[in-house]
Amino acid sequence: MTDPVLNVSDVTVARSGDPILQGVSLTVRAGEHWALLGPNGAGKTTLLRMLGALEHPTKGAVEVLGQRLGRVDIRALRAGIGHVDPRHAPSGALTVREVVLTGATNTAGLIPRWQASPEQLAEADRLVDLLGLSHRHNADWQILSQGQRGRTLIARALMPSPRLLLLDEPATGLDLAGREQLLERVDLLQRTHPDLASVLVTHHLEELPPGTTHAMLLRDGRTVAAGAVDEVITTAHISTCFDHPVRILRDEGRWSVRPAQPQLN
């Protein structure tokens, strides 16, 4: 068994005395692809920030890439983490290729007088192609669709060859076509990068890629269930997590939600 990429042990986070997370534990290994689900206010964003070394626990321990938060150079640690936030706003008038290249420097814009190496240019082009944007290499960021922006940001996050990829509601604001194109490419990444671990946050089961291997459900800052995806995303667990009776269906690797009782006309 490989060493954990992430190890969260009995973590509590409190702000102004109010608990945001309570007694949460999680272990993620290389090649695992986790979904983090729960209603608004469940603590998903706070947990994701800790996994990305952007926040520290009030109690408990968090190890990211084998390093314990509080005992490591955070800047060096973040170089091994790819973070995809659809709210990210590139600085300046950049093309798709240039936005992806900012992932090499982990900056919002291109650094003055910085020049990408031939290897970095080749990697940026490879990732743009991999994310299905080969026809948009030189397109301006401002004219991209929301779905194209999302895929560009995933390519950007992969530029430093991270061991861990964090996706914060990547399908937010996408129409049906944009969502499906994004999920198709995320699923492809899971096959082309077999050692990459990922954690994807969402409210919606329909936004989970078929390659999802594990899931954690949060409610009111506590774990409802965590483990292998087929054992966690069940009718009983989802109904409890969202405090609403539903039926969970899975077809060809994708999940959907139906009312617990057939609706009467």
Enumerate the predicted regions with their spans:
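The feature captures the beta-strand-to-loop junction immediately N-terminal to the Walker
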Residues: L37-P39
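Helix-to-loop junction immediately C-terminal to a conserved catalytic motif
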Residues: G52
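Conserved ABC transporter NBD signature motif
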Residues: G60-G70, L77
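Conserved ABC ATPase "signature" region
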Residues: L101, A116-R136
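Conserved ABC ATPase signature
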Residues: D140-L144
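Conserved catalytic motifs of ABC-family nucleotide-binding domains
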Residues: S161
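Catalytic Walker B motif of ABC-type/P-loop ATPase nucleotide-binding domains
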Residues: L165-E169
